[in-house]
Regions:
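Structured segments of extracytoplasmic/periplasmic soluble domains
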Residues: 3-4, 56-64, 114, 118, ...
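Pan-zinc metallopeptidase signature
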Residues: 162, 170-252
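Acidic/His-rich structured neighborhood in mature extracellular/periplasmic domains
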Residues: 18-162
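Residues in flexible loops and secondary-structure boundaries
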Residues: 9, 77, 100, 148, ...
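Acidic helix-start/capping segments at beta-turn-to-alpha-helix junctions
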Residues: 1-7, 69-79, 229-233
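Residue-level recognition of alpha-helix termini/interfacial anchor residues
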Residues: 1-7, 11, 33, 161-176
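N-terminal mature-domain "stem" immediately C-terminal to a signal peptide or N-terminal signal-anchor/transmembrane
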Residues: 1-28
Length: 252
């Protein structure tokens, strides 16, 4: 990594990636990396959308800050992430970048993370338990990013499985939401604990809670401010008025 850019090094530090892991990823999925060249034209058009994403966010939340966005080649660990600094940036793993419309949603989601101002204690997802946030906090953090990305891009956040099983999911989630085990709900694509359910259903629960709060608010700009500056996640859940439907949409 002698010639690595500052932002590739930042990505490496955040994801814990090293040269060996990158080489292994290329050997494991050569097609993914050989396709990067063909994606560059699409990335050029996606980059052209970045400023419009910021402009639309600024329109609904004028006090938002515009971070830098950088594309790097990673080891396939994440489509996007942000740096944990006082002046955070968005880092996009180009090897996992899909079509331009999906990429716009990824950029918008990560952009929202750079705007979130939550209590420092609980910000981490690993390490000592006292530093980690509850499942409720982390799910709202991810779900609110999906909601605001939806507002900015116009691309709906859909999950057919979750929509059909929302009441069941909420019953299970609410029993675990004050714990710090994320394995059944978040960042669990390769975790057998999720069973036969799709991965990352905590994103959906957090999205539904946040959407309920936003939809009930008369002042939408204030609602976005509230969502980005939550201090008490249990209180926010109560204020959202979230209550899952007893039946899936269209069910009788």
């Amino acid at each position: 990594f002698r010639g690595a850019s500052r932002w590739l090094r930042a990505y490496d530090g955040k994801m814990g990636m090293n040269r060996r892991q990158l080489c292994q990823a290329i050997r494991r999925s050569p097609g993914r990396y050989s396709a990067i060249g063909a994606k560059l034209g699409g990335l050029d058009s996606a980059v052209a959308h970045v400023d419009s994403i910021f402009a639309r966010f600024h329109a609904i939340y004028p006090q938002g800050r515009q971070p830098g966005v950088y594309f790097v080649v990673g080891a396939g660990m994440a489509a996007g992430t942000t740096t944990h600094t006082s002046d955070p940036v968005v880092l996009i793993g180009v090897e996992r970048a899909g079509d331009p419309s999906r990429l716009a949603s990824t950029v918008a989601h990560e952009f929202v993370h750079t705007q979130q101002d939550y209590p420092w204690v609980g910000i981490f997802t690993g390490g000592p338990s006292f530093l980690r946030g509850t499942l409720l906090r982390q799910s709202i953090m991810e779900g609110s990013a999906n909601l605001i990305a939806e507002l900015v891009t116009g691309v709906p956040s859909r999950n057919e499985y979750a929509e059909a099983h929302e009441a069941e999911l909420w019953a299970d989630f609410s029993r675990e939401m004050h714990g710090k085990d994320y394995s059944r709900w978040l960042w669990n694509g390769g975790n057998p604990k999720r069973g036969d359910r799709p991965a990352d259903l905590g994103y959906w629960i957090g999205y539904r809670i946040t959407k309920s709060y936003y939809d009930r608010a008369a002042d939408k700009t204030r609602a976005i401010h509230d969502i980005l500056t939550i201090r008490d996640f249990d209180r926010f859940l109560t204020a959202s008025g979230y209550s899952p439907p007893l039946h899936a949409p269209g069910a009788r």
